[in-house]
């Protein structure tokens, strides 16, 4: 079996990390596999196929297409960080995929002008599309805009020419199977006009094995010492730490930093430390510090993420929408309780008042209540054990990988039988 995994990047963002973990797991199980990406993320030395070839003319052409789409989004007033048509795709990508001749093509996050819907139609191999947001079945939004700015884009989805075109083009791709990491997004995909006739499967993302190996019962000051020695951040040893992770907490409104800020104002912050980690934009880091002066900020490399969670007493994920949140996944794997809103797939990971707290959607008062409830819990080790056991018992890496392998194998078998009947 020959599998080609396709995703925009390989490291940055939840979809990239999930796709890359699956890719690495396939290789570890002797499954012939490649990962095709558009943007190279530093630090990855795995064998991959690249779209942006070492050809200045192709690179120039792809950059021109990206600029054209960005201009179109600007003219139409669409939010660049939450909307993508991917009209043009990348030059020659469908041919590149078909030349590799895979048995299965596993799509993940392929917007951002990586693959156009017409490129997807041209792929000859059966497709398994692991959906990480609404884009595959929406009119272009990744997160419905009514979650972010109060406007409702869902009412006119079926009226847009682009949606009708997208539905029409994808209808020609009969051998397309949908995989949903969360039951929540799976139910939405099943009821969508674009995917209502496709086969659907629920397979959560594979957890990180090294996080599960982290000693979650060790003294938190040990992790704080590691972060200090590596010049990441100096967290106080005499205060409990609440951690919030996001690469772009201000420009990516979906991360819910505005709601966290309001909730933090309702917490007796002099007794606790808020750690804002993962910020990769200096302007946004400065902005966050101006709003919450007593917060600690840091850019955390993926290699030190386990220690970041390990130094925390709880992790808060105040997103407006989540599918199957990587942040929640990682925090629970490291044995840290999580406070988040009861939205999306969050309740598939967080059991209310067992391994964390599910606040009423977008209620900063209840978010603050959740933070205080965890920090004041009489037996924090109980919450930490429950957090880790949730992942160990219900999200086994081996079982989830087996689900993917069985799905891939069944699709290959069906495809081979259809080919024989055609002959």
Predicted regions and their residues:
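Aromatic "clamp/platform" in nucleotide-sugar-dependent glycosyltransferases that forms part
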Residues: 320
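Conserved donor-binding/catalytic core segment of Leloir-type glycosyltransferases
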Residues: 179, 233-255, 261-264
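Short alpha-helical donor nucleotide-sugar binding micro-motif in glycosyltransferases
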Residues: 307-312, 404
């Amino acid at each position: 079996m020959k599998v080609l995994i396709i995703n925009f990047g390989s490291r940055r963002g939840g979809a990239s990390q999930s796709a890359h973990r699956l890719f690495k797991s396939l290789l570890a199980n002797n499954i012939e596999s490649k990962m095709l990406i558009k943007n190279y993320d530093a630090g990855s030395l795995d064998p991959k196929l690249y779209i942006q070839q070492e050809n200045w003319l192709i690179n120039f052409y792809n950059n021109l297409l990206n600029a054209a789409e960005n201009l179109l989004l600007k003219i139409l007033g669409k939010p660049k960080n939450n909307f993508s048509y991917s009209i043009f795709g990348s030059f020659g990508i469908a041919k590149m995929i078909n030349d590799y001749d895979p048995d299965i093509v596993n799509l993940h996050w392929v917007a951002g002008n990586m693959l156009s819907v017409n490129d997807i139609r041209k792929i000859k191999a059966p497709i398994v599309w692991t959906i990480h947001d609404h884009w595959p079945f929406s009119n272009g939004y990744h997160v419905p805009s009514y979650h972010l700015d109060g406007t409702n884009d869902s009412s006119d989805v079926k009226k847009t020419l682009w949606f009708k075109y997208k539905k029409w083009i994808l209808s020609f791709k009969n051998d397309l199977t949908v995989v949903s990491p969360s039951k929540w997004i799976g139910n939405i995909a099943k009821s969508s006009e674009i995917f209502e006739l496709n086969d659907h499967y629920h397979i959560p993302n594979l957890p990180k094995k090294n996080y599960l190996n982290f000693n979650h019962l060790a003294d938190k000051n040990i992790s704080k010492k590691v972060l200090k020695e590596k010049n990441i951040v100096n967290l106080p040893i005499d205060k409990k730490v609440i951690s919030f992770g996001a690469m772009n907490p201000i420009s990516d409104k979906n991360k819910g930093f505005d709601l966290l800020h309001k909730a933090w104002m309702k917490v007796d912050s002099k007794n606790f430390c808020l750690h804002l980690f993962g910020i990769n934009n200096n302007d946004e880091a400065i902005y966050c510090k101006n709003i919450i002066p007593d917060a600690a900020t840091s850019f955390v490399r993926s290699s030190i993420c386990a220690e970041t969670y390990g130094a925390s007493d709880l992790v808060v994920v105040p997103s407006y929408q989540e599918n199957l949140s990587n942040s929640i996944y990682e925090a629970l794997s490291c044995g840290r309780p999580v406070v988040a809103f009861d939205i999306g797939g969050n309740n598939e990971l967080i059991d209310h008042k067992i391994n964390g707290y599910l606040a009423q959607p977008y209620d900063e008062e209840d978010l603050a209540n959740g933070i205080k409830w965890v920090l004041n819990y009489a037996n924090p080790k109980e919450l930490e054990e429950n957090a880790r056991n949730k992942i160990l018992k219900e999200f086994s890496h081996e079982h989830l990988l087996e689900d993917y392998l069985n799905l891939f194998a069944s699709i290959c078998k069906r495809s081979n039988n259809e080919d024989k009947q055609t002959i």
